[in-house]
Amino acid sequence: LKPNKKFTLLSAFITLLNDRLSESILLPILPSFVLLFDSKASTYGLLSCTYQLAQFTASPFIGLMSDRYGRRPVTLFCITGSVIGISILSFTVLFNWSNSIASIPLFLLFLARLIDGLSGGTAATATTILADISSPEKRAKTFGLIGVAFGLSFFLGNIFVVIFARNTNNNFIIPVLIASIIPIINFILVFFYLPETKPNSEINKSKTAFKNPLKALFTVFKEEKIKKLSLAFFIYFIAFTGLTNILIFFLQESLNWTTKASSGTLVVVGIIAIIVQGGL
């Protein structure tokens, strides 16, 4: 890679890392947030589904918008949504709701996860940036950085929880503040350092071709190889997301593990992901 491409590669990697880092911090402490306002396990499940469903719905449209308007502005838009969503979540958790109706903080939690999910296309856009700057023969190696970023975010995010979370009184002030600050830092880094990787000529071409996003999406799935690959990813992410979400709740509620202890299991997941993805 040329020096400017190396810099863009580093910027995209850091953008992806920071994006997943906030989620990795929130994952082990979200069950405790829900239990502050509702004792039902189903409520936590619905909260997780809200985020994942919103992300599933919005990501294809965000990818198409990045073709039409460029990678950089769409990435900034997504990060802005994350800042808003995590800020609402932080306010909900840190505010004293003792004299309020219980449904209000629950509504804000769901609203926060919905906004964060709808704007959760940073990973998809960063992946597209990596595709833009890498040659076909080096694309697989470059895409390996995505797995490294996910693994490293799992490792660092849960390390933050292990170090800063307190086992008493559901005190997660420092991890929540860290999770809130990271998207702001990410926005600043992208705004000043991440260049546009899609040429203006291609952006203008995409603007004229962009008519019906749903039609364009279904056109992609007419390709047999892409259809099979998408199905494989779909099955994998159902298993992985279900495992990580259920595991944390199971460890904390059924085995009475502390948040720090359950975060340690995700640290191991992060280490393995770094080794496997980096090695491949």
Enumerate the predicted regions with their spans.
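Juxtamembrane intracellular "pre-TM" segments in multi-pass secondary transporters
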Residues: L1-K5, P195-L231
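Helix-loop boundary and gating motifs at the non-cytosolic
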Residues: K2-A54, K227-A232, Y236-L255, T265
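Hydrophobic core of transmembrane alpha-helices in multi-pass small-molecule transporters
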Residues: L17, G85, N99-G121
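Residue-level signature of mid-helix packing/kink "hotspots" within the transmembrane helices
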Residues: Q52-P60, G121, F154-F155, G270-G278
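C-terminal ends and interior cores of transmembrane alpha-helices
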Residues: T80-A102
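Cytoplasmic helix-loop-helix junction between adjacent transmembrane helices
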Residues: F110-F150
